Amino acid sequence: MTNYNYLKLTKTKRIRYLHHAKRNGTYVVFLHGFMSDLEGKKPKSFLNFAKKNNLGFLALEYSGHGKSSGIFTDGNISKWTREASLIIRKIIKKNKFILIGSSMGAWIAINQFKFFKKQIKGFLGIGSAPEFLQRLMWNKFPKKTKEKIIKLGIVNLKHGNYEYPITLQLIKDGRKNRVFEKKIYQNINLTLVHGSKDKSVPVVYSRKILKIFKNANKKLVIVKNGDHSLSTFSWLNLLKKELKLIIN
């Protein structure tokens, strides 16, 4: 059984998180994707990895996601970035940590470098999707969809069996969080893993991230026949192998 905790950020905001404590040591911080949560295979797999390798672990659900409080349509990249930074500061304190960002989580992870420059030791990106709101959504919306979202402030999009709401404020906030023009000079281990058959986010997004990090020991791993989530047993093992290389 997985034990979840809640951290009260404000009088009305509670964030659910997974935590394995390590008083003086390195942590692994997992940041999940858009409309995801902590019930999937990745956070639990990385939690087990951390326990076996004598590491601390932290994963959280942004507001409006999973069992955290809040309404999804009130959220945006700025808010979710801030929530992640607050809970990292509260739980990890001054310990060093490795960031793992899955899909949108990689965008949130890149944003953490402005808060924790001296603490971040490495970064593992999985199907990384920075700037997806503008580049993969807004720029590809038909004219009618754009007109509807401008008029109503929201539109419901279908993706496979799911339907999710996209707000105008979310799109606009995404534009304030551009990262591809950034330059990050930290000397860290950086590995980006991307499925060759990722139908949600093209591998070029991982290539673009490599250009952001100027002094990193960096590599791109393209998983043959890999999908966007990379959540099968063998792919999770690959991710954990790459994480171990980042740590060592």
Where are the predicted features?
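Short beta-strand element of the alpha/beta-hydrolase
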Residues: G25-G33
